[in-house]
Amino acid sequence: MAQVAIITASDSGIGKECALLLAQQGFDIGITWHSDEEGAKDTACEVVSHGVRAEIVQLDLGKLPEGAQALEKLIQRLGRIDVLVNNAGAMTKAPFLDMAFDEWRKIFTVDVDGAFLCSQIAARQMVKQGQGGRIINITSVHEHTPLPDASAYTAAKHALGGLTKAMALELVRHKILVNAVAPGAIATPMNGMDDSDVKPDAEPSIPLRRFGATHEIASLVAWLCSEGANYTTGQSLIVDGGFMLANPQFNPE
């Protein structure tokens, strides 16, 4: 039986690119979508073109714990799970003094509670299978540094980074490796961009002077799912074009 990778929110952007790269590595792919079913179907068609299997399910992490049960159905359809990529997320911006509690909770529900439940479902199945596995949490560069006027998003990504480390320590005995990938400014639909926006000098405030492409995140995820990453767990790997190196003294030329 082929190995199985499930990528949440793989109807577009980083999630879709992860699905395609893992399909190229021979994984059968589980695809989840929240509001873009057509995008999920498009991802599935491209996955199948690589000679592997694709299954689709709607996943609503805004309604928990019931919403996460869709992941169990997807695992049942595919027969197993070897990789989970927690890519689904939500964000909102508002000054801290104006942040409404219900908006705060919406972000934490999806970004933290949803990742916790999906990881727990996946890890329990991996333990049952007895062959280890990989869990990759897509966090953000703002797991490490705050995003102005986005206290909920910043706090949620910090929490997901902490969860990554806690899971890594507890699950290593089951040969389940857990890591985070922390993207910087990536050209995704969530950011109102696509790959056409990845061009030289488009963003001089970033030392590499451009936005990142989705494949530059997905390629790291794919490596974390490979044998080359067998000694890597509990890490948060930043992919940000040098953003974290730029301080107020950084002077783009």
Residue map of PLM features:
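Conserved glycine-rich cofactor-binding loop
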Residues: D11-G13
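Substrate-binding pocket helix/loop in short-chain dehydrogenase/reductase
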Residues: P95-F96, E103-F108, A202
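Active-site helix of classical SDR
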Residues: S119, A156, T164
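Alpha-helical segment proximal to the catalytic Tyr-Lys
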Residues: R124, L169-E170, N230
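Residue(s) in the substrate-gating loop at a strand-loop-helix junction
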Residues: S140
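Short, small/polar-rich loop/turn modules that mediate ligand/substrate recognition or access, typified
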Residues: V172, L177, T232-G234
